[in-house]
């Protein structure tokens, strides 16, 4: 059996899953859903959401569920921090990133008037300020790379790869985190999508 990841290269959630696979060095095959207008995805899963995964014959949908399953079956290099309280905080930050930062991304990408752009940038300013405090004096949220950092990076990285927007330099802790992640993931630039199969 094999693992197939149904994905779109520009999706931040698909990037999150790809980073988890690479961190754990789990081999998998990519099925680009854009190549057949999601027909293979719909045929296998009965829905349109990515990432979805054929996990040795088991249909798994959603980046959070995919990450948890891969971590359970490949426990080396855990994507969660040590301790129940830290794991709970990690999951809360992942959820905040997935549910809140995505809306800020979409608002900025879809801003088609100067007013909409200004409002979207003001929303991001609040998030950047929060993240700047979170990463003060830290390379990662916890003592090493975890799913919280991966989820946050994937949302922020989307600004560079899809929105073509750079994080303002006044948020120095955030830009330092992004540079740290760029080096960790071996990206030539933040404008490059993450594609490596292992780290």
Range-by-range predicted roles:
Residues 166-199:
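Long hydrophobic alpha-helical segments typical of transmembrane helices together
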Residues 50, 76, 137-138, 153, ...:
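Alpha-helix C-caps/helix-loop-beta hinges
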Residues 77-82, 104-105, 140-144, 189-192:
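Short, hydrophobic secondary-structure boundary micro-motifs
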């Amino acid at each position: 059996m094999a693992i197939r990841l149904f994905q779109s290269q520009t999706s931040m959630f698909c990037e999150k899953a790809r980073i988890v696979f690479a961190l754990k060095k789990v081999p998998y095959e990519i099925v680009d859903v854009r190549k057949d207008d999601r027909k293979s995805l719909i045929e296998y899963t009965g829905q349109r959401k990515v990432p979805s995964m054929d996990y040795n014959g088991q249909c798994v949908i959603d980046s959070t569920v995919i990450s948890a399953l891969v971590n359970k079956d490949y426990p080396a290099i855990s994507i969660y921090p040590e301790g129940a309280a830290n794991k709970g905080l990690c999951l809360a930050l992942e959820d905040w990133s997935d549910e809140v930062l995505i809306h800020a991304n979409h608002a900025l990408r879809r801003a088609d008037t100067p007013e909409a752009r200004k409002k979207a940038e003001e929303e991001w300013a609040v998030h950047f300020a929060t993240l700047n405090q979170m990463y003060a004096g830290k390379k990662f949220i916890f003592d090493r790379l975890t799913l919280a950092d991966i989820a946050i990076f994937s949302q922020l990285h989307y600004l560079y790869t899809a929105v073509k927007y750079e994080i303002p330099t006044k948020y120095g802790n955030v830009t330092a985190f992004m540079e740290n992640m760029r080096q960790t993931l071996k990206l030539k630039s933040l404008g490059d999508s993450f594609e490596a199969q292992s780290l």
